Amino acid sequence: MPSRANSLQFAASRVQAYVSPATMTAFSILLFVGTFALSLWATWRVKAVYAKYSQVPSSVGLSGAEVAAHILQRAGIGDIQIVEANQLLGDHYDPMNKRLVLSSENFRGTSTAAMGVAAHECGHAVQHKLAYAPLGWRMASVHLVGFANMAVAFLPIFGFVTHMLRPMLIILCFAWAIIMVFNLITLPVEFDASARAKRILGEMGFYRSPADAEGVNRVLDAAAWTYVAAFITALGYLLYYLLPLLGGGRRHWD
């Protein structure tokens, strides 16, 4: 039975047979720059859209905290604390401590953006109550992805200092693969939470004008792109570190 090293060498030889080292290098650089640009664009877009609709008041005139309280009460969830965090767009649902964290702008704000963000985080709380499988998978992998994030942050420095480049690349590939899978699992979790938020707001009568639905939809749709960008970026980094192991520059990594 062939070893992993032999399998990797075989894969490298097959890639080298069809792709030149220069092409591999150019592709890896293009991939790196492209995914980085996508990440920047997604971050810029969600901030720009949020800034716009945070100035549009909702027709119901309720703060994000009040909207969240109404949604949780309707869902029969009474064991979650709604807390304020002094961090822009630091909103999240903490399933471990049963806390729904809203930034000050969304906790106190009465904008359509605040209403949408609060409802989205409530969507995660509803997922938790219903034992939504992808949320459970993400919760189970949090510690593992934490180690992977530490690896991708410090291993490049360690590898270049010790000149153990090939082992560094192999470990980085595994780390980015873990991060990529985590971000892949995150996609259905976030998309489902947004879908629940839009539906619940409509069912509860929070949309009292077309501007209400527009603001919520635009903010949540823009946020969705950040999760897509995170997945594509992780995939890009995985390929970026994997290509030197398979490509023509292989002897420099031995």
Label every model-predicted segment.
Residues 1-26, 249-254:
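Short, strongly hydrophobic alpha-helical membrane anchors
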Residues 20-23, 27, 134-141, 161-171, ...:
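Membrane-interfacial loop-to-transmembrane-helix junctions in polytopic alpha-helical membrane proteins
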Residues 25-31, 159, 170, 235, ...:
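Hydrophobic packing and interface segments
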Residues 30-34, 154, 158, 181, ...:
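Core hydrophobic alpha-helical membrane-spanning segments
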Residues 43-148, 181-254:
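Polar-ligand-bearing catalytic/cofactor-coordination segments
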Residues 142-165, 170, 200:
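Post-HExxH zinc-binding segment in Zn-dependent metallohydrolases
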